[in-house]
Regions:
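Residues on the lipid-exposed face of transmembrane beta-strands in outer-membrane beta-barrel proteins
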Residues: 1-5, 40-46, 74-78, 132-136, ...
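Outer-membrane beta-barrel strand-turn architecture
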Residues: 5-9, 46-50, 62, 70, ...
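Conserved C-terminal beta-signal and adjacent last beta-strands/turns
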Residues: 87, 216, 222, 237-344
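Transmembrane beta-barrel strands of outer-membrane/channel proteins
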Residues: 15-21, 56-60, 74-76, 87-91, ...
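Outer-membrane beta-barrel signature, preferentially recognizing the C-terminal barrel domain
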Residues: 79, 84, 91-152, 162-163, ...
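Face-selective signature of the C-terminal outer-membrane beta-barrel domain
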Residues: 1-66, 72, 79, 144-147, ...
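Gram-negative outer-membrane beta-barrel transporters
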Residues: 9, 14, 47-54, 148-151, ...
């Protein structure tokens, strides 16, 4: 439910409400859980001075388990000509997911057993987010620079716990389907817990350019420094990536009833952090795809496509072990072929 109102000149007011219900059903642990969330929100955007706009918002969230929470948001934007400067503050609330609360999970991946427990004693996360953004846009190029800081209290993290003799006995009792061989390979299990706080800060740069008609280049770079603290110790947030970039080039042209689209894109990233395991190494993976639009039939458009994923055959060839984690799962270079039919 959403309404957009013009209550005064040079302003826009948005009010609304939404309802959501989540379900978790799992045979492992005989789990059958559900929870609803109801929220009402209001946002008012107004012109303060020439090129200066303020936006104020408020959201009231009622969670079936974690009660009511009020979160404000404020943005100030100065927009002279092709430039945009924004400052944003927002408070956040996130209830633990049903998996984080109730998981009772056992699986075997690459021959390694994995166990994850939810925790019904979790508290919801509350956060304070601040960002500064500058943009330049023209018909040829767009450039955006954003710096952000997110402080999170009671951050939900997955703690890895070493398996001793007492823990192994407990785990075998909880998961009788686990074989003796699988139990012998089990070194850790995971439990969702609240850390004291989390700290995520970074910088993001976006650039896109229309080099000439039909040809576009874009690039994105993100630097992220993410940590979590329990007690006096700060640790790098599990699965965080310090440096990540995406690059894409796209060309499109039509000759009569034939259209060609060529897309080259790549993702490059530094290592993925796993504080209790071996970090997953960084990688660069490139894909080349072409799409061909054919308008030769009276009853349909045909769009055959052909491309290559992982163009340079990047593969993580490390020998597997119980401490090893992965970020690149590609088996290697792959030929991708498709056909789309659009009826007229």
């Amino acid at each position: 439910l959403k309404g957009i109102l013009g209550l005064t000149a040079h302003s826009t007011t948005i009010v609304g409400a939404d309802w959501r219900k989540d379900y978790l059903t799992a045979s492992s642990g005989n789990i059958e859980e559900h929870v609803y969330t109801l929220a009402a929100y209001a946002q008012h955007e107004m012109l303060l001075l020439k090129d200066l706009t303020a936006t104020l918002g408020l959201r009231l969230t009622h969670h079936e388990t974690f009660d009511n929470h009020l979160t404000p948001k404020a943005t100030l934007m100065y927009a002279p000509g092709n430039l945009r400067f924004r400052a944003t503050y927002s408070a956040g609330f996130r209830a633990p997911g049903l998996d984080e609360l109730y998981y009772h999970y056992f699986s075997v991946n690459r021959g390694k057993p994995q166990i994850i427990f939810g925790n019904q004693e979790l508290s919801p996360e509350k956060s304070h987010y601040l960002s500064l953004n500058a943009e330049y846009r023209s018909e040829v190029i767009a450039v955006s620079l954003t710096g952000y800081l997110n402080r999170i209290n009671d951050m939900v993290v997955r703690q890895n716990i070493n398996v001793d003799e007492a823990a192994l006995t407990m785990l075998q009792r909880e998961f009788p389907e686990m074989t003796a061989d699988q139990a012998a390979k089990l070194e850790r299990y995971s439990l969702y817990q609240n850390s004291d706080k989390g700290d995520v800060k970074g910088v993001q740069v976006n650039v896109s350019a229309n080099v000439f008609r039909g040809f576009n280049l874009s690039a994105n770079y993100v630097y992220t420094y993410a940590r979590t603290k329990s007690g006096e110790a700060w640790t790098t947030l599990e699965r965080s990536i310090r440096h990540a970039a995406t690059i894409a080039a796209n060309y499109h042209h039509t000759w009569g009833k034939y259209g060609l689209n060529v897309n080259l894109n790549g993702r490059l990233q530094s290592k993925t952090y796993y504080p209790d395991y071996e970090d997953a190494p960084g990688y660069g993976a490139w894909n080349l795809h072409t799409t061909h639009s054919l308008d030769y039939l009276k009853w349909a458009y045909l769009e055959p496509s052909i491309g290559i994923d992982n163009l340079f055959d990047r593969v993580d060839r490390r020998i597997d072990s119980s401490l090893r984690k992965y970020a690149l799962y590609s088996p290697g270079r792959m030929l991708v072929i498709g056909l789309k039919v659009k009826f007229k």
